[in-house]
């Protein structure tokens, strides 16, 4: 499919001037995100600028896909697209849209990465249960509507001041379907920020589905206790090595057919003889046995055996004491917004037994965005 789509027009877009920018809260290769307010009503919104690097070639197909998906998805745990606005400008051969295009969203006060970067923000077990319940509920909804998020990470999980979680940044999302022939689907595998990328994508899988998002959910769930990403690889090979060291060696015994399905499996030098250590490595942080068990089921190497969102929501973790509890009271003690973009880099190397000689890059937005390939 072409990277740009010429047939898009926005004749009924409101003028951007109805909003006043207040602060920049996000930055990446996708563009910029601003906190803003409606000049008349005072309503707070988030403005995401559509990156138009080569506007003369047409409207970016990736932005169009994001807009179409956001217009389809309406759920309490998915960010709400209010409207599309544009600035005034003169049409030229380089800018047929006469200015900039902005996506306007309901404003959320925090993202999960920003909250976890603040040592003063402390989640109780009951509050972690509520976070994961809302996250999995959002995934259940989008997967039921045949949408893959494809960029699950803590920075893309927004939380309002009232404690409502919203899955956000659908810039990499796409519709999926069951393969109609023996050749399967041919989706790009260069999706998902590296530290949250599941083993099947790292091995070159192109016919994938909802399990890729559930792997990210498992990484995020563990992060609720470790406070930083649990597998911080520098390269795809390094990421697979870290996965093997935590989840056990990738073999046909635990993942039937892996040796025949993926050409990369034979080419990569993956650790041999590694035992699965998810529970052992995390038990220093995660004291609840049900939580450990759910993380273990989310971080299963074989996507066919990985727990889905429906079964995850029915896991004993959510139905044992303490029951999930509202986040509003805890968040009410914090008066400032917390976003990854505005926070100092999070502490690193929390997980024990990480290789000591690896040179790791900070978990900055630019690092995570490096892997965004459409």
From Swiss-Prot:
InterPro entries hit by this protein: CDK (IPR050108), Kinase-like_dom_sf (IPR011009), Prot_kinase_dom (IPR000719), Protein_kinase_ATP_BS (IPR017441), Ser/Thr_kinase_AS (IPR008271)
Where is composition skewed (Polar residues) in this entry?
A: 354-368
Q: Name one Pfam family in it.
A: Pkinase
Q: Which organism is it from?
A: Danio rerio (Zebrafish)
Q: Which GO terms describe its molecular function?
A: ATP binding; cyclin-dependent protein serine/threonine kinase activity; protein serine kinase activity; protein serine/threonine kinase activity; RNA polymerase II CTD heptapeptide repeat kinase activity
Its Gene Ontology biological processes?
A: cardiac muscle tissue regeneration; cell population proliferation; DNA repair; inflammatory response to wounding; positive regulation of protein localization to chromatin; positive regulation of transcription by RNA polymerase II; positive regulation of transcription elongation by RNA polymerase II; protein-containing complex assembly
Which regions form coiled coils? none
The Swiss-Prot or TrEMBL record describes its family as follows: Belongs to the protein kinase superfamily. CMGC Ser/Thr protein kinase family. CDC2/CDKX subfamily.
The protein's name is: Cyclin-dependent kinase 9
| List of residues binding ATP | 25-33, 48
User: Positions of the region Disordered?
Assistant: 345-374
The reaction(s) annotated as catalysed by this protein in its Swiss-Prot or TrEMBL entry are: L-seryl-[protein] + ATP = O-phospho-L-seryl-[protein] + ADP + H(+); L-threonyl-[protein] + ATP = O-phospho-L-threonyl-[protein] + ADP + H(+); [DNA-directed RNA polymerase] + ATP = phospho-[DNA-directed RNA polymerase] + ADP + H(+)
């Amino acid at each position: 499919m072409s990277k740009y789509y010429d047939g898009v027009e926005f004749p009924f877009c409101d003028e951007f001037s109805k909003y006043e920018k207040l602060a920049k809260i996000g930055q990446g290769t996708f563009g910029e995100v601003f906190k803003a307010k409606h000049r008349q009503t005072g309503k707070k919104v988030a403005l995401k600028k559509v990156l138009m690097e080569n506007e003369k070639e047409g409207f970016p197909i990736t932005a169009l896909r994001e807009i179409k998906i956001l217009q389809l998805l309406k759920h309490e745990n998915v960010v709400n697209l209010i409207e599309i606005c544009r600035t005034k400008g003169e049409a030229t051969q380089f800018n047929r849209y006469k200015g900039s295009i902005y996506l306007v969203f309901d404003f959320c006060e925090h993202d999960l990465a920003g909250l976890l970067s603040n040592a003063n923000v402390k989640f109780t077990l009951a509050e972690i249960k509520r976070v994961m319940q809302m996250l999995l509920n959002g995934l259940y909804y989008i997967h039921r509507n045949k949408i893959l998020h494809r960029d699950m990470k803590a920075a893309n999980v927004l939380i309002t001041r009232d404690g409502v979680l919203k899955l956000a940044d659908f810039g990499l999302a796409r519709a999926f379907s069951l393969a109609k022939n023996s050749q399967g689907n041919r989706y790009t595998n260069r999706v998902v920020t590296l530290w949250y990328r599941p083993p099947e994508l790292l091995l070159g899988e192109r016919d994938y589905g909802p399990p890729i998002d559930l792997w990210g959910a498992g990484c995020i769930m563990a992060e609720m206790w470790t406070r930083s990403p649990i597998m911080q690889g520098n390269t795809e090979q390094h990421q697979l090595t870290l996965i093997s060291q935590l989840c056990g060696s990738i073999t046909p015994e635990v993942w039937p057919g892996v040796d025949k399905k993926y050409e990369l499996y034979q080419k990569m030098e993956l650790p041999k003889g590694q035992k699965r250590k998810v529970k052992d490595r995390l038990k220093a942080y995660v004291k609840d046995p049900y939580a450990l068990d759910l993380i273990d089921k989310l971080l299963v190497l074989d996507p066919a055996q990985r727990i889905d969102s429906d079964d995850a929501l029915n896991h004993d973790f959510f139905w044992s004491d303490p029951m999930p509890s509202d986040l509003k009271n805890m968040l009410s003690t914090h008066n400032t917004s917390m976003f990854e973009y505005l926070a100092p880099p999070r502490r690193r190397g929390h997980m024990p037994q990480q290789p000591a000689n690896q040179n790791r890059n900070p978990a900055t937005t630019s690092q995570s965005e490096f892997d965004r390939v459409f």
